[in-house]
């Protein structure tokens, strides 16, 4: 029988682009784990994606995962756009690579290991876990320690993709 894990995640960026961070809470029964990291130069959407990716990648076995986020970009991307992107070899209608391709490839790989239900909440409306994740993400953005290699090195303009 698969374990039920509840995940809450949020991303933050001080300036966009700017220093950023994510905060993710994983909850299994009475156990809770907090994941966070701060990046020197990134975007808000990348941090929203990173929070979910790192949460899912930290799970050691297949689980039923209920993910609560405030990012329409992530929710729409994963529930509506990703199948089309994959069919079109990750290109937009203008034949350009989608933004944040490195992260969409990671999330696309990791979601296949789990049974996921996605929940969206409006940001800054008092949802307890979303507010906690927002605070954690902002704190990490204020003290970055990691380089967002793909973003900082213009990964998307590299012809050797």
Swiss-Prot record:
Domain of life of the native organism: Bacteria
Catalysis performed (reactions): Endonucleolytic cleavage to 5'-phosphomonoester
Record text on subunit structure and interactions: Monomer.
Keyword Nuclease: yes
InterPro entries: RNase_H, RNaseH-like_sf, RNaseH_domain, RNaseH_sf, RNaseHI
NCBIfam families: PRK00203.1 (NF001236)
Entry's EC annotation: 3.1.26.4
Residue positions binding Mg(2+) 2: 10, 134
PROSITE patterns attached to this UniProt entry: RNASE_H_1
Broadest EC class assigned to this enzyme: hydrolase
Binding site for Mg(2+) 1: 10, 48, 70
Name of the protein in its database record: Ribonuclease H
Keywords, ordered alphabetically: Cytoplasm, Endonuclease, Hydrolase, Magnesium, Metal-binding, Nuclease
Domain RNase H type-1: from-to ranges: 1-142
Cofactor: binding details: Binds 1 Mg(2+) ion per subunit. May bind a second metal ion at a regulatory site, or after substrate binding.
Family stated for the protein in its record: Belongs to the RNase H family.
Gene Ontology cellular component terms for the protein in this record: cytoplasm
Physiological role: Endonuclease that specifically degrades the RNA of RNA-DNA hybrids.
Compartment(s) of residence: Cytoplasm
Cofactor(s) essential for the protein: Mg(2+)
GO molecular function, one term: magnesium ion binding
